[in-house]
Amino acid sequence: SEMCIRDRLMTYEWGYTYGPPMAVAPLPQVRSIVDYAVTEIPVNKINLGIPNYGYDWTLPFVRGTSKAQNIGNVEAVQIAIAHGAEIKFDPVAQSPFFTYVQDGLTHEVWFEDVRSIHGKFGLVREYGLRGMSYWQIMRLFRANWLLQEGEFFLT
């Protein structure tokens, strides 16, 4: 990190294409990465990586066979609406999720919303990090930018 102007922490992909259904970036795991990073990297160089996507798993999950579909945050909400699914919020992971049935198959979806991103913004402030960076930034998620504008001075 001495040679870097800034470091980007990849704090996501806990829930991933070939893994079991879970939050993409559960807050306790994100915090543990930041806890370690600040012991090795000056905080003014650290950008917290934030996912701008989610995954849709078909259940039951079978390791080595199952493959989740990568979806955008807006797409996740659209799927929930289309199937009348209730979006729940995991208080530990600080992440939204829901299940739905399509063609007789149960699906489980985990994604990011303003509540989960707000929790990650809290870590940026708490640790005094330089800022944040996004994976899959080109996926439209206007609510993120509105939240960001309300919480940070953007340059």
Task: State what each model feature region is.
Residues 2-5:
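Short, small-residue-biased leader/transition segments that mark boundaries at the very start
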Residues 7, 48, 124, 132:
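Conserved, mostly hydrophobic/aromatic
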Residues 9-14, 49-55, 111-114, 135-138:
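Active-site-proximal beta-strand/loop segments in catalytic clefts of secreted hydrolases
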Residues 16-21, 56-61, 141-146:
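Extracytoplasmic/secreted cell-surface and envelope-processing proteins
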Residues 18-24, 106-110:
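Second-shell loop/turn segments in exported
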Residues 30-38, 121, 146-151:
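Generic structural signal for well-ordered alpha-helices
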Residues 44, 130:
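Short acidic/polar active-site loop segments enriched in Thr and Asp
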Residues 50-123, 149-155:
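Glycan-binding loop/region signatures in secreted carbohydrate-active enzymes
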